[in-house]
Structure formats: C-alpha cells, structure tokens
C-alpha cells in the first residue's frame, strides 16, 4: 500500500489486459460472481489503499477470452504510469495479465475513445476432441463446414446496418445500429477463424452471428435466407448462440493509441492454434 502521507498526484492510466475467460463470469463486476473487472479493481485497491473504478472498452460475456482488452482508471500516488502493469500483476491471479500500462490524458476513455473492437471466433472441426484447444474453440464435428459460404454470408454485413437479429435480450442499448468495418472467415488446418471488426457490438452479437454462419456453412440455411433474416430483423429465427469459449476479444483500436504494436495479439493465436503441432501429434 502506498504511504498516505506522500504528496498525491492524479493520473489516468490505460491498461492492456489479457485474460482467460474460462473461470470468469464476464468482464463486468457482479455480486457473488468472479469477474475480471473485480479482480483488477481489488488488486489496485490493495496497492492504493482505496477503491478505484476500472473502465473497460468492452464487456465480454462469461467464458469469453481477451487477448488485448483495454481499460483505464484514475490513480493517485507516485507510481509512474508505465510501471503500473508490473505492480498490478504481482497482485493478480494467473488467468489475468496486464500486458502494458501507459499515461493518457484526462479526457481519454477506454470505451468512448475507441474507434473499433475486433473479435475472433474459432471453430475446431476435427472429429476427435483435443484437450489443448477445447478451452479456446467450438468443437464442431457434426457436419462439414464450407468456409467459403460462411465468408460469402459475412460480406454483405460490411457497412452500417440495423442488426437487431443478432441482439440478445437484456441489453440496455437503445438501438441496434452497428458499423461493421472488416469481416473475414478462413480455414487454417482443422480450424475455422471468423474475425469481425466494428465500431461497437451488440449484446451477444458475435456468438449469435457465428451460430447462424455455421448453419450456412453446413448447408442448413441458404445464403439468401441468411441475408434476408438479418435485413428483415427476424430475431425470432436466431435461436442458437455459439459457445462462449470460442470467442476472443483481439484488440481495441484508438486514433491516439498510447501503446506500441507489440501489445497486440498477433503471435498469440499462432501459438495456441498451431496447425503444424496438431498435425504432428497424430
């Protein structure tokens, strides 16, 4: 704990946060549930001697992972902003890591200053399960998936659209407009990766969308039907969300991002989902 008699200076500190979502009930603090926000706030409180509020760029659901979530808090004390990462890490459990910390201006906000969020969903398509990838993917082996059809279904989503069909109940958001900036679906060995970048995401949007894409890729639903469904906002037909463990928040982008590019996720998925290692293990 910091010495309360030291001169206090207030600074806003931004964090890049990585976490394994398996044993968390999401990002946002909740009573009687373990959450990422609560764990980090508790760690900071032990350092400062009082509670601070941590603001995240996105509220990931229960079981969802993050390679580079971004958050900020206001601190009083003499700890330099760039040292906060290592200080907080010494108080955190092993399934959360602060990758970097930096000073930002008092008007910078992890959520409201963000230009985009990018998510990746991973599907594992081999018949046999693999315990090393199960925590990070949806093991879908019920029917072959055509990733080219899934990519074709994604393309019309580019741009600004009313995506109420992929909006779970329980959200406080007053509208369902989303500007989709990038979409991609590609196969890497036994894995299909779906990436979506947008200015913001509706509650449950990616998992509902992936659930429908799998229906397209498996031939259960046509491309035309999929497009009509979301354009006509037929939410009642979107019944199955993809499992949470396959989803990962990859990055959050800002016009004035205060970190160097090495905090990004780029090498992480290659280590977790290495095609060569899986092939060689057979």
From Swiss-Prot:
UniProt-annotated binding residues for substrate: 119
Known EC number: 5.4.99.12
Pfam families: PseudoU_synth_1
Record GO biological process: tRNA pseudouridine synthesis
GO MF annotations, alphabetized: RNA binding; tRNA pseudouridine(38-40) synthase activity
InterPro entries listed in its UniProt record: PsdUridine_synth_cat_dom_sf, PsdUridine_synth_TruA, PsdUridine_synth_TruA_a/b_dom, PsdUridine_synth_TruA_C, TruA/RsuA/RluB/E/F_N
Family of this protein: Belongs to the tRNA pseudouridine synthase TruA family.
NCBIfam families: hisT_truA
Purpose: Formation of pseudouridine at positions 38, 39 and 40 in the anticodon stem and loop of transfer RNAs.
Subunit structure: Homodimer.
Protein name (Swiss-Prot/TrEMBL): tRNA pseudouridine synthase A
Source organism: Nostoc sp. (strain PCC 7120 / SAG 25.82 / UTEX 2576)
